[in-house]
Swiss-Prot record:
GO molecular function per UniProt: aminopeptidase activity; dipeptidyl-peptidase activity; endopeptidase activity; serine-type endopeptidase activity
Activity regulation, per record: Strongly inhibited by the serine protease inhibitor diisopropyl fluorophosphate (DFP), chymostatin, leupeptin, 0.5 mM ZnCl(2), 10 mM o-phenanthlorine and N-tosyl-L-phenyl-alanyl chloromethyl ketone (TPCK), but not by N-tosyl-L-lysyl chloromethyl ketone (TLCK). Activity is not affected significantly by iodoacetate (IAA), L-trans-epoxysuccinyl-leucylamido(4-guanido)butane (E64), pepstatin A and phenylmethanesulfonyl fluoride (PMSF). Activity is stimulated by addition of 0.5 mM CaCl(2), 10 mM EDTA and N-ethylmaleimide (NEM).
Source species taxonomy: Bacteria, Pseudomonadati, Pseudomonadota, Gammaproteobacteria, Lysobacterales
This protein's name: Dipeptidyl aminopeptidase BIII
List of catalytic residues: S506, D593, H625
Gene this chain is encoded by: dapb3
Amino acid sequence: MRHPAFRLTLLASTVAFALAPQAAQAAPSAADRIAGTELIARDALFGNPERANVQISPDGKYLSWVAAVDGVLNVWIAPADNPSQARAVTQDTARGIRSYFWSYQPDTLLYLRDSGGDEDFHLYAVDLKTGQAKDLTPFPKTTAQVAGVSPKHPGTILVGMNDRDAQWHDIYKVDLASGNRTLLEKNDAQIAGYIADADYTLKYAQRSRPDGGADVLRRGANGAWEKFDDIPFEDVLTTSPGGLTLDGKTLYFTDSRGRNTAALFAIDVASGKRTLVLEDARADVGGTLADPATGKVQAVSVDYLRDEWKVVDPAIRADLEKLEAIGPGDVSVNTRTLDDKTWIVAYSAAEAPLVYYRYDRSAGTLTKLFSARPKLEGKPLVPQWPVEIASRDNKTLVSYLTLPRSADANNDGKADAPVPLVLLVHGGPWARDSYGYGGYNQWLANRGYAVLSVNFRGSTGFGKDFTNAGNGEWAGKMHDDLIDAVQWAVKQGVTTQDQVAIMGGSYGGYATLTGLTFTPDAFACGVDIVGPSNLNTLLSTVPPYWASFFEQLAKRMGDPRTDAGKKWLTERSPLTRADQIKKPLLIGQGANDPRVKQAESDQIVKAMQAKNIPVTYVLFPDEGHGFARPENNKAFNAVTEGFLAQCLGGRAEPIGKDFTGSSISVPVGADGVPGLAEALKGHTQEVKK
């Protein structure tokens, strides 16, 4: 497997010699190769978006979006016919607001906010007339879950709250004006989730079983829950009830039982008759578009190489065909008014960030509203290429390759010459990489690196067989898939064996640690962002409200409650092999991470120090599972950029002022990254929760 890498390296050296016959010269560095391409500032890529999450209120009265107020993201509204008359309606001064939605109550919107990344999200209602915000879940250590909104009851909302029992959410009907809550369901039955009809009657529920499967329950005539359906463990990530139409007559159900990829079915509530809505042999069904007045599904997305919308209701076929034909990139429908006359749509291409439009259905007109990141317009962004890579046991790994301009002059997705590569590993791991604009992909390509994002086994979206193939394979075949993808890139001439870094967050951080401990010669360096180092301590410290998911974790990873499981998890933990690390490692961690606790990073750093192995450890005291504050994200990426430049030879924008406003601290290894120690000397830490 190493011979192709050797030949590619030799070829590059030979070409360099042939072009300069009088004196042997080293092959140009990644920075030299891309020197003629404009360097895109980190602030343009990772600073606050100018406008994002654009929506329209159900009554069509307002446009809304998130944008910065004094550098902090807040919710803004404007008259739908006059976006220039915008005003901020929230006043967050710390982490910012990213998740919000409209209620059906006129002049009322809702948003979610946690503290310092602790993921104890509270739900707030904002009265647009008075500007007052009310915490609808004013209880400590409570994580709100929105369980239902209904146009039939615009003044109330269903909310799950775990203030009584941290593990399980009780269901309340909450009055938006007063904040008063009425208990609808005390969750003594360990229910993982509920489905309510438009009158807020709880009709269906799902409960996890000790075998890792789940029971779907239905409310019986006597008011008690009774078993409605059975989901085996192997189907539980790809099978679940979705929701009811507004008349309560149809239940939508995503189902992989008796098949590989998940299909969408419609179930007649009265008769139990199941009707296939959509299936695809390549990939699981994804998101849906539903009629806002009836809840009837009208289109279903399927994402194999790229996301495609499949129309199942002719009423919107012409609309989607028109929108897809206009471009640029792939279209998504953000929100629709209740009368369905107006849609807010967004277009995204790999080489262009989101652009938002207003679509008037009756006139058939599309009006541009905003670009999420106008600073990137005209910048040298590059395409992304979907590829299918065969693993060593012949599984198909849908992956995405991004090439720097210096390596793909004719823009055909084929490397002209090998360049350093960053293997960018997604988190989850029960998630997936998809085609589209990615700030990290563009940033790394602009610095001179190829970027490869791989859907390794265990990823979701490609059928249950592919997902279940990852069971018990942390640091096993899941990691083999990443190694196989790198070998593919070497054989394709994208890179050479000695020029590959591994980087990722969450599971991607674990994959980075695995790469440097289980295969210590495979990568030139690694960047671990909030990755677990010890699978036993990871599983013993998950949030209490993950109780309904824990049996799945135990079956897919290893059971820390048994001796055999503990042994297995120890064997698959990078901490166990920390003494094998021989390549440079950068670690980033949020101190308030509720999923991957700070101890996960602390303990591997301590183990490396005990063996005198260098490491650079960056810690943010006001972050959780990832870096939400743009100041912190930019700060960490500034460190990462210098780290990768030292390791792979790409170019690096100086740290400059990118620590300003951040809470960055570097407990260990500040001298391991060029310019880091000096930048810290003049930095004043700003902690905002």
